[in-house]
C-alpha cells in the first residue's frame, strides 16, 4: 500500500510587515477590527484555529508593509494576552515581542456600568486596573465594576 504524505498548504512568508502570532483562538477578527482592517489597501492573511503546542489552537494575522503602533499593541493585549508581535523585514524576523498588559488601562474601553461616572456627560476618562492577565479581568477605577474577557471582546 502506497502511503503518500498528505498535501499541505502553507501561507507564503511576507517580505515586510507584521505577523501577530499566538492570538487566542477565534479572536483574529477582533484584532482586524482594532487595526481597522480590511481597509481596501493592505494585504492581510488570517489563519484561524491553527494547532498550537502552547495554546491548543491559535489564530495568526499577517499584515504586509505595516508595523503596529504601541496603542494598537495595547488593545491587542486586552483580547489576546499571549500574542506575539513579529516585525518582518526582507523576509527575516528582526524584532519579536510578547504583548503585555499594563497595570492600568486608560481610554481604550468603556465601563459597562451605565451608572458609572465615565458614562455621564462629565468627560471623565475610562480607567481600569488589571486584576488578572489570563483570563483578562479588569476593575473600573471609579465604580469598581469587574469587566471580564467576553465584555472586553464585545467592545472591539
From Swiss-Prot:
Question: Where, by residue number, does the polypeptide cross the bilayer?
Answer: none
**Required cofactors, per record?**
Zn(2+)
Q: Is S-adenosyl-L-methionine a UniProt keyword of this protein?
A: no
GO MF terms listed in the record are: metal ion binding
Q: Which residues form a coiled coil?
A: none
Q: Which gene encodes it?
A: pyrI
Family named by the database record: Belongs to the PyrI family.
Q: How does it assemble?
A: Contains catalytic and regulatory chains.
InterPro entries, alphabetized: Asp_carbamoyltransf_reg_N (IPR020545), Asp_carbamoylTrfase_reg (IPR002801), Asp_carbamoyltrfase_reg_C (IPR020542), Asp_carbatrfase_reg_C_sf (IPR036792), Asp_carbatrfase_reg_N_sf (IPR036793)
Q: What does this protein do?
A: Involved in allosteric regulation of aspartate carbamoyltransferase.
Can you tell me which residues bind Zn(2+)?
111, 116, 140, 143
What is this protein called in UniProt? Aspartate carbamoyltransferase regulatory chain
Question: Which HAMAP family did the record assign?
Answer: Asp_carb_tr_reg (MF_00002)
Q: How is the cofactor bound?
A: Binds 1 zinc ion per subunit.
Gene Ontology terms describing biological process: 'de novo' pyrimidine nucleobase biosynthetic process; pyrimidine nucleotide biosynthetic process
Q: Name one GO cellular component term.
A: aspartate carbamoyltransferase complex
Keywords on record: Metal-binding, Pyrimidine biosynthesis, Zinc
Amino acid at each position: 500500500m502506497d502511503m503518500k504524505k498528505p498535501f499541505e498548504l502553507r501561507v507564503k512568508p511576507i517580505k515586510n510587515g507584521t505577523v501577530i502570532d499566538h492570538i487566542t483562538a477565534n479572536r483574529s477578527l477582533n484584532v482586524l477590527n482594532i487595526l481597522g482592517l480590511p481597509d481596501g489597501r493592505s494585504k492581510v492573511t488570517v489563519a484561524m484555529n491553527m494547532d498550537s503546542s502552547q495554546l491548543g489552537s491559535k489564530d495568526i494575522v499577517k499584515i504586509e508593509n505595516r508595523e503596529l503602533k504601541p496603542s494598537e499593541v495595547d488593545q491587542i493585549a486586552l483580547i489576546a494576552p499571549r500574542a506575539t508581535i513579529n516585525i518582518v523585514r526582507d523576509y527575516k524576523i528582526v524584532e519579536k515581542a510578547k504583548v503585555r498588559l499594563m497595570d492600568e488601562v486608560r481610554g481604550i474601553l468603556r465601563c459597562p456600568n451605565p451608572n458609572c461616572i465615565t458614562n455621564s456627560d462629565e468627560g471623565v476618562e475610562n480607567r481600569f486596573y488589571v486584576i488578572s492577565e489570563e483570563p483578562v479581568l479588569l476593575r473600573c477605577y471609579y465604580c469598581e465594576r469587574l469587566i471580564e474577557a467576553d465584555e472586553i471582546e464585545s467592545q472591539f
